[in-house]
């Protein structure tokens, strides 16, 4: 399929993909992370998490200095060596976190939708919801261009809520455990395409791309990849792509980082 010697970018979701959904362990993927690092193949993290959370995790994973995609594509953290690019160190897409909060508060007040955002609670509550430490939970509240929430209303009201958001230029995106509100123009796919184009411009050659994800919000990212790994996940809706050619897409039997490793094993040994 491809070799570790060719120009390659690996885009990876975090929770439920590279990280275990419950323990946040990534050790089953560690050998591949080391191998990719030694081959100078960037592993670009893509998540609904804030850039503050992701920079912390990026360092723990040994991926510091690489670009990353935060808040479902609404934020792009640039690579350390891209200091000449406009917007360094981060590019923010569309409506800001504060503006989205204002919209949500008005909708909740006037139309009585029931939901709880991360801005409504303290870090201790988020730590309880997520299993994170309080210091890590505090990083989850540092949104720049999205809002994370728990939906506490009916499916019928959700449809009305989504329609209202769309009218206001916003989208409602489902993650592994929470829902996210962000600018309608933002997305993991747009952010990934921007990063791919930047690498192509700098190297003079378009790199081959491999994406890994486990949730519905990863589908746009995986659609624009040359090859995709759909890691077996907890979400009942799963991931469905328009092009699921077995030569391009691999669905893992294992979950989390074990599935991540399985996907890398498949594509690097398939040819």
Swiss-Prot record:
Pfam families: Hydrolase_3. Its cofactor is Mg(2+). Mg(2+) binds at residues 13, 15, 214. Coiled coil: none annotated. The keyword Transcription regulation does not apply. The lineage of its organism: Bacteria, Pseudomonadati, Pseudomonadota, Gammaproteobacteria, Enterobacterales. Belongs to the HAD-like hydrolase superfamily. MPGP family. It is found in: Cytoplasm. Its EC number is 3.1.3.70. It catalyses: 2-O-(alpha-D-mannosyl)-3-phosphoglycerate + H2O = (2R)-2-O-(alpha-D-mannosyl)-glycerate + phosphate. This is Mannosyl-3-phosphoglycerate phosphatase. GO terms for cellular component: cytosol. It comes from the Bacteria. The active site is at residue 13. One of its GO terms (biological process) is mannosylglycerate biosynthetic process. The keyword Cell inner membrane does not apply.
